[in-house]
C-alpha cells in the first residue's frame, strides 16, 4: 500500500494530477484474481483511504489512461515492463519511426496490449530512456534520481530537467506531510 501512496503523492505533486487513480497490476480486473502477493496487495491498498484505489489493472491497459494513472507492481514485473517499453522504442527507432509498420508486425504478437496511443509521439518519448533520463527514488529530504550507468549526455540532461520539475513541485515536502499523517 505504501507504493500506492508514494505513486499517488508523486502524481499529484510532480505530474499535477488532482486525484490519481492507483491500481495493482494483475492478470484480471476482478478482485479475487492473481497470486497470493497480488491478492494481499489488493487487500492492503483497498483498505488504505489515503489514495484513490481503483482495483486491479491488466497489462493491456497500462499504456493507456483508461483505468489507472499509477500502477503498482512487484520489482520483477515492473522492471520487465520497463525493459519491454525500452525494446519497443528501439524497434520503432530501427524501423525509422515507421509506426504503422511496427504495429502491423507486433499486432499478432501482442494483440491489443498496444492501444491507439501507439501512433502518438508522446507514447514513444515515454518509452525512450534518453527522454526520461532516470527514475525517481522518492527521497524524503530531497529528490533523488537513478539513471543507467551508460546514460548519454541527453539522458543526463533529461534527468536534470526531471529533477528540476520535482524540486519546483515541492515533492519531498508533500511526501513528508503524507508520511506524518500516516
Show where each model-derived region lies.
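Glycine-rich phosphate/nucleotide-binding loop
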Residues: 67-71, 75-182
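Glycine-rich oxoanion-binding loops at beta->alpha junctions
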Residues: 56-65, 128-129
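Glycine-rich phosphate/diphosphate-binding loop of Rossmann-like nucleotide-binding domains
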Residues: 1-59, 69
